[in-house]
From Swiss-Prot:
One of its GO terms (biological process) is translation. Keywords: Ribonucleoprotein, Ribosomal protein, RNA-binding, rRNA-binding. GO terms for cellular component: ribonucleoprotein complex; ribosome. SMART domains: KOW (SM00739). It comes from Trichlorobacter lovleyi (strain ATCC BAA-1151 / DSM 17278 / SZ). GO terms for molecular function: rRNA binding; structural constituent of ribosome. This is Large ribosomal subunit protein uL24. The gene is rplX. One of two assembly initiator proteins, it binds directly to the 5'-end of the 23S rRNA, where it nucleates assembly of the 50S subunit. Part of the 50S ribosomal subunit. Belongs to the universal ribosomal protein uL24 family.
Length: 108
């Protein structure tokens, strides 16, 4: 089985381009290839009821839920907006993601 390739990776700063969290930015915490989804820090918060275990108290906690990968786009800090990316091959053979508009590097 072939692994899926996405335009976002763990640690990238992304902006949500559709849905209830539209126009908000955050850092990608996790990429979920089986669900075609990403988890973004502080966005798409849901409440979960947690049962008490041992010395941990129970109660209602908030955590991030997954967003579909098509609803997020990489955020360029130079352009200050979500952008499409291009893969640029450097002279040493290394691949680097760059902004299509301003040609700046989007690597972490």
């Amino acid at each position: 089985m072939q692994t899926k390739k996405y335009h976002v990776a763990k640690g990238d700063t992304v902006m949500v381009i559709a849905g209830k969290e539209k126009a908000k930015t955050g850092k990608v915490l996790q990429v979920l290839p089986k669900k075609d989804a990403v988890i973004v820090e502080g966005l798409n918060m849901v409440k979960r009821h947690v049962r008490a275990r041992g010395n941990e108290p129970g109660g209602i906690t908030e955590k991030e839920a997954a967003l579909h990968v098509s609803n997020v786009q990489l955020y360029c800090t130079k352009c200050v907006k979500p952008v499409r990316t291009r893969i640029k091959v450097l002279e040493n053979g290394e691949k680097q993601r760059t902004c299509v508009k301003c040609d700046s590097s989007l690597e972490n």
